[in-house]
Amino acid sequence: MSDHIWSATASLPNSRPPPLASSLVGIWSTVGVPKVAQFDNHANFRGGIQPVYQHFGPVVATCLDLGVTPRFIPVAEPWRNGVIEHFNDVWDKSFFRNETFTSLDHLRTENTAFIEFHNAYHRYSAHEGATPDQMWKYRLCKPLSAGYRPPTRLLTQTRIEVVRYIRSNRHIDLFGKGITVTEDQTHQYVTAIIKVRSKKVIVITLDGEIIHQGDFNLSPVLR
């Protein structure tokens, strides 16, 4: 993962999973396909409604189809996506609140102009004074084909990562599927790796210790 900022956005008629998946396709067609895509735990990204943990949605399916590992941050820890939150603040205060839009098409047009200006001229301390375009000039690679379309079913390949903090109740919640660990494994961050093809899940500590292995049923139907 990188803490460098290079912006590409999509203006959507709504934030439901299918439009979000399509927006990812549009963005990755511009900036290239990443190895990992990090999301919060909102159902629009994850798909499905708890406790039906077996179902993921179009965003996750698109990641798996392109060989991207979807990684979900710990619950109620938005700072894990701090770079995104920082850009959202810049976008909101420097653009969205300062303009009046007559339609969604108008917003899209003005948003495209803002993004081009932002990437060419906005400077962040994390870039040591460089602009996003300067930072990413030689980093953008593996562009997505313009003809790509998001899948309509969950593919059985790669994996899904879910980061969680184990509290004193010894409980790990994976979108409705509960896992209980021993008391000596509490008060630490772990990563649950859902192996899509084998429909298994393993839970690993930061030290690389496997503290749980079990089944994780998955449905090919997207929700």
Where on the chain are the PLM-derived regions?
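RNase H-like DDE/DDD metal-dependent nuclease/strand-transfer catalytic core used by mobile genetic elements
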Residues: 2-106, 110-112, 117, 209, ...
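C-terminal, beta-rich DNA-binding module of retroviral/retroelements integrases
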Residues: 119-223
